[in-house]
Amino acid sequence: MPPKKVPTSKTSSTPVKSKGTTTKPAAKKADSQKAEAAAAAAAPPPMPPVTTISMKALGRLTEEANSKDPKKWPLVIDLQGNVATFFRYRDANVLQAELPGDLDADKLRRALLGALRFGKPLVLDMGSHDIREVEMVNDVEKNLLDSLLDKTLLDDERYLTLVKDQDEKEYHNSAYYATDRFSFVVITTNPSPNTLIAARMTCFQVE
């Protein structure tokens, strides 16, 4: 008699899929966190604290700003529109956004160099304009606004890169500069200025 065949198992050789948790929820959570982080990065920073200051105290504006944060220049919220006139009487280099051509690249460059050389304030009176328009400073030199706002422009005579061949010879020599007395001020009549700039400055409001 022929030998009996041993019956083979009919179980499929295909592996059984695990019914455990999948990675999809974790991936969705990670994507959600990335989206939230991107949204937070895109959102404007909050308005920084605003200190009230009198017109009389504006003569000490730079000192007041330095006492709060020595790495920041002052932003003045001027609802009455008198602060620019105050600075003109103090021999500052005042440029007005309201005047056509006043913020042209070469005029800005010369006003900045003059303020650095003679140790005077450079004042950008933005009036009712969006103060983010101060970014036109970058038309003078790439990333100039960053180095101006964080004061690194004053380090290692970096400001000399702004000097052109046609400028007077005194501008080519750092010995003729009084940068220790230089200051930078932005004025706005907007009670709620753009925080992309305001957050990088020390904010005051004239009472």
State where each predicted segment sits:
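Low-complexity, polybasic segments enriched for Lys interleaved with small residues
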Residues: P7-T8, S12, V16, T21-T22, ...
